[in-house]
From Swiss-Prot:
UniProt cross-references to PROSITE patterns, sorted A to Z: METALLOTHIONEIN_VRT
Residues engaged in binding a divalent metal cation 1: 5, 7, 21, 24
Lineage: Eukaryota, Metazoa, Chordata, Craniata, Vertebrata
Name listed for the protein in its UniProt record: Metallothionein-1E
Keyword annotations from UniProtKB, A to Z: Acetylation, Cadmium, Copper, Metal-binding, Metal-thiolate cluster, Zinc
């Protein structure tokens, strides 16, 4: 369970715009939980690694 997210990892949940998930793996999470991922990136909620603040993450390149 992500301490910043009210849902179980990989569980079904909805993340609001104020979601502070750092490692959000919720299948229904619609926002980008990764600062370098665009909102709507389908793979972002499955776990991604940011290469840098201004770079795209490994799963959204």
């Amino acid at each position: 369970m992500d301490p910043n997210c009210s849902c179980a990892t990989g569980g079904s949940c909805t993340c609001a715009g104020s979601c502070k998930c750092k490692e959000c793996k919720c299948t229904s999470c619609k926002k980008s939980c990764c600062s370098c991922c665009p909102v709507g990136c389908a793979k972002c909620a499955q776990g991604c690694v940011c290469k840098g603040a201004s770079e795209k993450c490994s799963c959204c390149a």
